[in-house]
């Protein structure tokens, strides 16, 4: 069932809001310009760090012993990332010997969706009709339903066996990721910044015997709201805990989730073959620091050649450069459009005229934004690459 709200805004209110938005538009232009400038410097310096590291990196075929001759050198090596550390989730008691153990928590909640339609009125005013709809979804964190617009979902108390009404949770946990402190790489030890990049996580195989059911039951809180909605008679907290596959489900029935139910999924990252590029420091590694201050290190899953790893690094740097360029241009164009928007509102007493002027402002903002962005990029290119330009 949808809930609607209608808001009428006068021409004067719209004009005042448009002029207030000019300052925001100027900030957006400055922000977008700074992003474009900074990105060109970042791209150039990152490329320099990659090139500097590439010249200095040497292949190491044997990592079965610590070689003092490699101290302080940048190396490329392939080997097994292994560990004997036992990781234990403090809240659920789940244990495994692995490089990483992750916990993902989801809550079954009412979520609010809105859709607005604005109609311009003769005289410059606007009428905005906003429709709010609600659906049950699994989300990453509890949703504060007191901010919902429909009172039936924000403040109203549900009738018996009716799950309309405020959100609720049976328990409150957060996502967490645990990492092994001792991960071997041949005779060397991988530092945390490389350990955290190891992928290949797989679902845990859980059973009621492998989790701390008592600790979970203590964390469960069956509110009056949940009981009134779903429970015909009081139940013990441990009766609401279900373990199957890689998931611990907190609720009555995993097959028919209710508002307030919680599900927690566990994954483990087993030992794996990896390839790294990093600077040797005693029996471990650190990031290579280039002469321009930028750092460089890489970890790839499986066996990857030095050439492939550097090509991937260059490709990622180039891709990020274009992503940030596009973002910067969009921000500049949006800022210009916001600065010029009062012109459209000024003629808004005639809706058709406002539409025409608005379309013109959009085109002008796009052209000016592109031109200004290209100027900023060109000047930044000359600033950071004087020899190339």
Predicted segment positions?
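Alpha-helical transmembrane segments forming the membrane-embedded cores
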Residues: 7, 320-324, 328, 335-389
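Short extracytoplasmic
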Residues: 56-91
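Hydrophobic alpha-helical transmembrane signal-anchor segments
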Residues: 13-42
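N-terminal Lys/Arg-rich, disordered targeting/topogenic segments
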Residues: 1-13
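Domain-level marker for long, solvent-exposed, non-transmembrane regions
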Residues: 2-5, 38-41, 76-78
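Cytosolic-side membrane-insertion boundary helix
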Residues: 11-18, 291-334, 358
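Soluble non-transmembrane domains of integral membrane proteins
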Residues: 80-82, 86-283
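Alpha-helical transmembrane signal-anchor/signal-peptide segments
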Residues: 39-63
């Amino acid at each position: 069932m949808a809930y609607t709200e209608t808001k009428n805004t006068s021409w004067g209110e719209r004009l005042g809001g448009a002029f207030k938005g000019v300052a925001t538009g100027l900030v957006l232009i400055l922000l977008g310009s700074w992003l474009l400038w900074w990105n060109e410097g970042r791209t150039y310096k990152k490329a320099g760090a990659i090139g500097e590291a590439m010249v200095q990196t040497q292949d190491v075929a044997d990592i079965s012993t610590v070689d003092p001759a490699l101290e302080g050198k940048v190396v490329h090596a392939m080997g097994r990332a292994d560990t004997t550390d036992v990781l234990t989730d403090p809240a659920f008691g789940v244990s495994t010997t692995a490089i990483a153990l992750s916990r993902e928590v989801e809550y079954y909640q009412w979520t609010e969706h809105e859709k607005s339609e604005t109609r311009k009125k003769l005289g410059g005013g606007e009428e905005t009709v906003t429709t709010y709809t609600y659906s049950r979804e699994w989300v990453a964190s509890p949703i504060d339903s007191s901010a919902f617009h429909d009172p039936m979902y924000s403040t109203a108390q549900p009738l018996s066996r009716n799950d309309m009404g405020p959100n609720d949770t049976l328990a409150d946990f957060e996502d967490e990721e645990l990492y092994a402190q001792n991960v071997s790489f041949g005779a060397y030890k991988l530092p945390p910044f490389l350990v955290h990049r190891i992928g290949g996580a797989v679902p845990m195989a859980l059973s009621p015997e492998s989790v701390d059911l008592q600790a979970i039951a203590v964390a469960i809180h069956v509110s009056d709201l949940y009981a009134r909605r779903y429970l015909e008679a009081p139940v013990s907290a441990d009766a609401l805990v279900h373990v199957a596959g890689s998931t611990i489900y907190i609720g009555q029935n995993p097959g028919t989730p209710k508002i307030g139910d919680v599900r927690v999924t566990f994954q483990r990252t087993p030992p794996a073959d990896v390839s790294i590029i990093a600077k040797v420091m005693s029996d471990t590694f650190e990031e290579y620091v280039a002469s321009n201050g930028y750092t460089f290190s890489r970890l790839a899953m499986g066996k990857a050649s030095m050439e492939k790893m550097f090509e991937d690094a260059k490709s990622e740097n180039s891709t990020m450069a274009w992503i940030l360029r596009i973002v910067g241009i969009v921000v500049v164009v949006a800022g210009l459009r916001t600065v010029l928007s009062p012109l459209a509102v000024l003629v808004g007493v005639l809706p058709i005229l406002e539409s025409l002027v608005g379309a013109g402002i959009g085109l002008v903002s796009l052209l000016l934004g592109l031109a200004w962005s290209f100027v900023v990029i060109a000047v930044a290119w000359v600033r950071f690459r004087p020899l190339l330009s």
